[in-house]
C-alpha cells in the first residue's frame, strides 16, 4: 500500500503556485491548503463576532473559537464552506489587523503543522518550507522570471478586460513585491527542489511534480 506524503511549497509571488499545485492535488487525490486562507477565515470569524480590531486581546481570545479545515480543496470555517466569502473586500480591509499579532502567527503555524499529519496534503504559503514544515517529505520552491510573471499577468488582465493594463507597471510591481518578500524572509530551503517555470507550461510542471510524488510514495 502506498504511503501518502506531505508536500510543502514556497516561491515567488505570481509564479503560479496555486494554479499548479491545486491541479496536482486534484489529480492525485490530495488536499490542497493555501495557508493564507486561514488568516482570511480567521478575519471573517472576527468580523462575524463583531470583534474590535483595535483590541489585540479580543482578537487573540477569538482563536479559541477558530476551527479551520479543508474539504474537497475548499476552505471551511467552523464546518461551513467559505471559499467565496473570504475573498470579499471587508476581509482585505481588516486582515492586516490580525496577521502581525505573534500569538495569531504561532497558533496558525501549529495548526498548519497539525493539519497535514498522516500525509496526503499539499501546503503552500509563507515560510512553509523553512519554518512551518521543514521536515516535509517533498519541499518545492517555485520560481519564474520577472518577465515571465509580468507577461502572464498582462495576458490575464487582457482576458479579464482590465483597463490601464501596462506591462512595465506590472514588471515594476513584481520587482517591488519580490524585494519586500525577500526582505521579510522569503528564501529557498537548502533541500527544496527549485522549479523555474519561466519557459515551462503549467501542465508539464504538474506532470513533473506528480512523477516525483509517485516516486516518493513508493509507486
From Swiss-Prot:
UniProt GO BP: pyrimidine nucleotide metabolic process
Q: Quote the catalytic activity from the record.
A: CMP + ATP = CDP + ADP; dCMP + ATP = dCDP + ADP
Top EC category: transferase
Protein name per UniProt: Cytidylate kinase
**Chain residues that bind ATP:** 11-19
What does UniProt list as this organism's lineage? Bacteria, Bacillati, Mycoplasmatota, Mollicutes, Entomoplasmatales
| One Gene Ontology MF term | ATP binding
* Record has Nucleotide-binding as a keyword: yes
- Localization (cell): Cytoplasm
Q: What is its EC number?
A: 2.7.4.25
Matching InterPro entries: Cytidylate_kin (IPR003136), Cytidylate_kinase_dom (IPR011994), P-loop_NTPase (IPR027417)
Instruction: Record the organism.
Output: Mesoplasma florum (strain ATCC 33453 / NBRC 100688 / NCTC 11704 / L1) (Acholeplasma florum)
Q: Which GO terms describe its cellular component?
A: cytoplasm
Q: Which NCBIfam families match?
A: cmk
Q: Which family does it belong to?
A: Belongs to the cytidylate kinase family. Type 1 subfamily.
